[in-house]
Every structure is written in C-alpha cells, then in structure tokens.
Amino acid sequence: MEASGKLICRQRQVLFSFLLLGLSLAGAAEPRSYSVVEETEGSSFVTNLAKDLGLEQREFSRRGVRVVSRGNKLHLQLNQETADLLLNEKLDREDLCGHTEPCVLRFQVLLESPFEFFQAELQVIDINDHSPVFLDKQMLVKVSESSPPGTAFPLKNAEDLDIGQNNIENYIISPNSYFRVLTRKRSDGRKYPELVLDKALDREEEAELRLTLTALDGGSPPRSGTAQVYIEVVDVNDNAPEFEQPFYRVQISEDSPISFLVVKVSATDVDTGVNGEISYSLFQASDEISKTFKVDFLTGEIRLKKQLDFEKFQSYEVNIEARDAGGFSGKCTVLIQVIDVNDHAPEVTMSAFTSPIPENAPETVVALFSVSDLDSGENGKISCSIQEDLPFLLKSSVGNFYTLLTETPLDRESRAEYNVTITVTDLGTPRLTTHLNMTVLVSDVNDNAPAFTQTSYTLFVRENNSPALHIGSVSATDRDSGTNAQVTYSLLPPQDPHLPLASLVSINTDNGHLFALRSLDYEALQAFEFRVGASDRGSPALSSEALVRVLVLDANDNSPFVLYPLQNGSAPCTELVPRAAEPGYLVTKVVAVDGDSGQNAWLSYQLLKATEPGLFGVWAHNGEVRTARLLSERDAAKQRLVVLVKDNGEPPCSATATLHVLLVDGFSQPYLPLPEAAPAQGQADSLTVYLVVALASVSSLFLFSVLLFVAVLLCRRSRAASVGRCSVPEGPFPGHLVDVRGTGSLSQNYQYEVCLAGGSGTNEFQLLKPVLPNIQGHSFGPEMEQNSNFRNGFGFSLQLK
C-alpha cells in the first residue's frame, strides 16, 4: 500500500492531455539555463520554477510539478510549497565534470494536468578551491656547460583540478644569475614551464644549482604550488635522442585488457657510450594518463594500466620523453583513440506512473518514461516495445521520451491487473536489452468505510508534559484498495462546548498519532474525552469515528502550602504556653494543604529546628505541636520552632513553617510583643474613617432628595382623593395612607392607598397601588403575586390590585 501511494500521481489523463504534452514538448527545444557556484551548501536556492514557468502558486501545486534527470542521481530538489528549486547536496565540479568545460547538468521539469515538460540545464561554475600540485616535487635537469644562452629545457608541469581562470596561469622561478622560466601552452590548453638559459655555465665555477619552481593559478586570491629543480652542469654531450617519428596515432578498443600493448616508440642517439644509452618515460603526463598508461623505460612499449571507458574519455594525448645518460632528451607525442564497443545496456528512467487506473477511463496516460544508452553510434540507437496482447499503446514523444496509454476501455470484472513489460533494445552487435516490468491495477469503487481497531481508546498522560508530546495513537483500516483505502484522521467537534479541544490535542492526519499541544495540569483538568474521525479518500468519501478518553496523571508539582501559622512575612503569631503545662500539652497545630492528589498530597510533619531540642514534638501525620516534657525555669521564655512539611511524592516537595512560642507563668498578663506593622494599621484605620464619613454624606443627600420627591407626590394625591369612591377610615392612620413595612429582603417602606368598599358587607381592604413608583432594581416578588388575598393583624382581608 505504501509503495503504491508513492507512485500515485493522477488517476485520469485523457488523450487531449497527451496531445497538449506533445505540443508543449515540441516548443521546449531550447533548454532553460541556470547556474550555481560549486561547493554551494545543500538546500541552497537556485530559482523559483513557478515564476519561470509563469504559473501561480495554486496552479503550480495543482499540476504536480516534478524534476527528473537521467539516472538515479538527482542533484536538485523541488519545494512543492514555495516552488523553489533547491540544491539537493553540495556539488563538486571536479567530481562531476573533471576538466570538461562548461560543466552542465541536464534535467527535465515535468507538469501534469495536462502533461508538459521542459528541458533545463544547471551549469556548475568553478571556484578556485584547488592549488597547483607538482607530481614530482624534485626535478633533475642536466645542462651541458657548452649550452649557449637561450637554450630551453622543458620542465614537468603542475596539475590543477580547477579550470579556466582558476587553472595554472604562469610559472616563476627563484632569483638566480643563469636561468629564467617561460610559461608555454600545449595544444590541449595546459601550460608547462620551460627553463631558459640566460648565461653560459662553467662547470668548473659552479657544478650544480638548486632553484625553486612555483606554479601560480589565476584565481583571486591566487593559489600556488612549488617544486625543487636541481640543475647539474655536465660536460659536453652534443647529441640528443631522436624519435623515429615525432607523432604517433593509434586506435584501441575500450574493452582491451590490462597490460595490453598499445604502441612501441623508438628513439636513437648517435652518441656512444653512456651518452648513447636511452631511457623512456612519460613526460608532463596528467594524473589520468599516469593512471591509465605505463611505458617501459628500456623498450619504449606503452601498455594499459587500467580498463578504458569510451563514455568517459574518447582519446588520450601522451607525451613520451627519451633521455640519454648525458641528460639530453627528445620528445614525441602519441595520440591514442578509444574505439567504442557495445558495453552498456539501455537504461529506462520512469518519470510518471499511474496505478491503479479507473476501469471507466479510456485513453488514460499510464506512464511517462525516457530511455538512454551511454554508447555511441549504432550502439546508442534504441528501439522500445511492449507485449502485443495488452490493451495498451506505446507512443514515441519528443526526444527519447515515451508515453504508455490505455488503448481501449478496461473492464475490471474481467481482469483486475496487467503485467506490462517494456523492452528496450539497442542496435549494437551484440544487441543489449533492458526489461522494465510494471503492474497496472484497475481500481474498484469505494464501498467500505474505515474501521477503527477499537471503539474507544483510553490514554494516560502525566501532567506537566512537554508540548507536542506523543500521547497515543488511533488506527483504522479500510478494506478497499488504492486511494479508497487511504485513511486520514481528524478531530471531531467536542460534545462539550466548553472543552477547548483545539488547544489541548492534535492528530496527525496520516498515521493517527495524537499529540498534546500544551502542558496539562491535573489540578485544572483530570480527564476529558473527544471523538476521532477516520475518512478515506474515495469519492464519495466514507468515514467512521471512535471515542478517545484522556486521563491526566498527577505529578508532584505542588509544594505544600502552610495555611497556619501564616508565613507571609507579616508580624509573627506567638503561641502562649503555661510553664505548668504537662507533657503532651497541645501548643498549636500546623495546617497545610497540597494542590496535588493521591500520595503526592499525603503530608507529613517533622520538627526541623528548635530553640530547646527535646522540649517540643510534632506529630508526623496531623501537624500537632505538643510539649515533650515538663517545662522548667531554665527553659528560655521565647522559643522558636521550624516545622518541615513534606509530601509523599517522588521526589518529595516540602515547605517550612516558623512558630514562635512564649512560655508564661499565667495567662492574666501575657507578654505579647507589639507587631511591627502597628503604625501601618493606624494609617489604615484613619483612611477607613474618612471613607465612612464620605459614604454617609452621600447617602444623606440621596435620602433627602427621595423624601422631598415623596412629599410632592403626596400633596398631589391628597387633592385627587376627594373625588374618589373610597372613604377614609378613622384611626391611627396619618391621613389616608397606611405604611406597610417590608420585613423581607427589601429595606424600603411602601405606602398603599387603603379603600374600604362601601356597602359591600365585607371587611376587605383593597390596596389599589403604591403611592411611590417602583424603584428600579426592586420588585414585589412572586410570592405576593401568587397570593394576593391575605389577612392582616386587624382581621381584615387585604386584597392587592
């Protein structure tokens, strides 16, 4: 399932998309060029493909842009979120291209929906990261004393892995009176030093010279390498060795074995004796030539030292030096051309592959791939084919790209999968063949919902956890295949609207891993539960859910807190103990609490310090401080005790409480030191008096205003009472009003009009309405509304209206 998930790109691509692909490929003949300096760190920015392709970010993500290149080595990576093309690793131009210039890495940019691709190339720019190196740190040059000024002596060159300006620029030699050095350039562009005699030598005056040869490259700053040149002045040897021909051209097959004889060169010297003895050697050979060829110093035979590879080097230019015993030498050049053989099988690079494909989608693009062969000529020409009994069609695209399409609609009920073999054959002799097998699956409809392995999950998390902690996982499986079986997980809205689920946990949508987003506190939240949903990616999508319970485990993260005696830094509280107290007398009790639970909240007490050790004791489980023995006159009157309160957690947390005990002979006039905070209390009492006076003044003004308003309202009522139908009874009532004093939670006095209905024959008062309007914020209450008829103390029935 994971393998198919990596290969899934798109499920549908119609023939119209393929036609668009062909058109776009035909118009992309000119590759897009980018450049990067070698040794640039991996993940460095190269370009933004969305801008280069003229795509918006949303369209760029939708079209599934990818970068591919020949072979398995991919030097670039594409950030799908930002469309940035980044280096996949640090590039070394010398490892990638050697002395080839420019160093170009070719790749392709593929787009889908519709299919498009663009050729592109990345040029790796050389930096001066290599110094010139002489393969021979010491050179011996024998110069005849008869050599005239101006005679030149070629020296062995230095090697520099850099190219262009960073390669060797010139040579210099240490100051001397006889020689100078010139920088010469060979046909292949390499530079070598040539020692030129400026002044005739005299062996009798100076038999040898020691000079330092320095090679400088053209970098900034330049790098250099040195070698020692030993010049031996010899007697006259007037003939140098001469080769039979100055230039040799040979051809050799790339599959020639090691020690194979490439060619034999020959030189002669007309001198006699030691001056006529000739030895052969490679001259100014590069590191690659020295590793590939060797020359017999006596016979001049050039043989192979390692296997040739036409794909790396098509030819070699080898310089051979013949030197006699007198120090004179002759040179010749051997051009060795490598003949290609069919030693590389074709390679297939898969760029896009879609499986499974829906059974009801004809002419769907199944795969896009490219073929290549490292050989040349007929050995590099390729043919591509598939089996004939399959409902697929293989079409050639631009360059060496091929597209595999469904030729007819597929029927899953008749066949659920197809094994397709792509056969790639070159035209060499003998022919080499490569096979690529693919399994194309036909997808089914989505008819199975994901099923959790459990209907409910219980997870345990210890409080004070680190954020993003993995607390557990849920898992669901789907019996479908392909995308219909790909399950994504999500958190469903909690049933408790007050539960901040989004800030408590998160879920990995791909694997169902649950993470705590923040540190949990057992004292604030002991447990919570939520539902998790699992949905497949079918169309339409099917889903299921499971219940997850999270139980927070308590940790010992709260130290005991002493409630009594107070330890807030104020004046200490002094406990009085009579000197006549018996052993076991209860002095006081240390009261402490712990915010944790369980054994983390089990508190124990012990006496940590005391003015008189052994005089007092503390009960370990309840914190009671009692006398341990009889008090004596020698015991100090003031005692200071420090009690340690410790919980039972691991590791335990603790707090201390300080007690002040005063031993007195009696309680009639105990000596109590005045608190140090007494002056501050006096200031607080003075402030309280001012506040009370101000509040009383404001209340008096408000009450006076209310009474004035009531008086005006009563005057208006007295005029209107003369035309009413109610008679005014005689009695202790002031005027025609009755004061009904509230006895409940209301503190105001309410006045009602009391009317006795004439001729009714009943002793009923009707309280029509209150004279004063309702004061906002008070109500008469539902009790009075439900029972409006009641009896008063005078035997009348009162009726509220």
UniProtKB/Swiss-Prot annotation:
Q: Which Pfam families does this chain map to? A: Cadherin, Cadherin_2, Cadherin_C_2
Segments passing through the bilayer: 692-710
Residues in the Cytoplasmic compartment per record: 711-801
Q: Which coarse location class applies to the principal site listed for this UniProt protein?
A: membrane
Q: Which InterPro entries match?
A: Cadherin-like_dom, Cadherin-like_sf, Cadherin_C, Cadherin_CS, Cadherin_N, Protocadherin/Cadherin-CA
Q: Which residues form a coiled coil?
A: none
Extracellular topological domain ranges are: 30-691
A GO BP term here is:
cell adhesion
Q: Is Hydrolase there in the keyword field?
A: no
Q: Which SMART domains match?
A: CA
Q: Which GO terms describe its cellular component?
A: plasma membrane
Look up and give the membrane topology term. Answer: Single-pass type I membrane protein
| Cysteine disulfide links | C97-C103
Q: Mind telling me which Gene3D superfamilies this protein's record contains? A: Cadherins
Give start-end of the signal peptide. Answer: 1-29
Lineage: superkingdom: Eukaryota
Query: Where does the record say carbohydrate is attached?
Result: N419, N437, N568
Q: Which GO terms describe its molecular function?
A: calcium ion binding; identical protein binding
Give all residue intervals belonging to the Cadherin domain: 36-134, 139-243, 248-348, 353-452, 457-562, 569-672
The subcellular location is: Cell membrane
Its function?
Calcium-dependent cell-adhesion protein involved in cells self-recognition and non-self discrimination. Thereby, it is involved in the establishment and maintenance of specific neuronal connections in the brain.
Instruction: Note the subunit structure.
Output: Forms homodimers in trans (molecules expressed by two different cells). Forms promiscuous heterodimers in cis (at the plasma membrane of the same cell) with other protocadherins.
Q: What is the name of the protein in this document?
A: Protocadherin beta-8
